[in-house]
Amino acid sequence: TQKIYSPLNGKKISRVALLTGCVQRVISPEINEATIRLLNRHNVEVVVMPDIDCCGSLNHHLGKKEKAKLSFVKNIESWHEEYLLNGLDAIISNTSGCGTTLKDYGHIFKNDKEMKKKAKKISELTKDITEYLDENLKLDIKKNEEKKYKIAYHSACSMQHGQKIHDQPKELISKTGNEVLDIPDGHL
């Protein structure tokens, strides 16, 4: 069964699915836990689908096309059914490589008559956590007035090139009162 994490105050304003990822779930599960807490604190219900454990990109990058396609189809079908039955406002990825793959589902299945529409919908619903926070939530971020830091930020290649996300992560950091420094040649 799916795991549903409800807002603590019971005042749900949105419902999203979270991709927990095959690698992240094992190596850094605290990132998923923090994502769920953050969304819940801002009245967002989070659902984690039990049958979705990998976006499929690892097999895709290793050239294991059939295995990758099985993951893609399973994910698309599962999220699309959840979208139709219970509603989803977004599918959240907090790993840029996975997010890029999910956003590519529509392109990957553009010539597949059976999967085309569903894959396109899943791609449209997919948001990086920084996109979702910026576009959907009015975050009241407490500024650090005591000590300001200079924070060097380097966007992952899959974030800046694959998903075309440039400003949201830096804007979120800036809202804390700290200065964001771009790394020379960070676009490479």
Can you say where each PLM-predicted feature lies in the sequence?
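Iron-sulfur cluster-binding electron-transfer modules in prokaryotic oxidoreductases
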Residues: 1-188
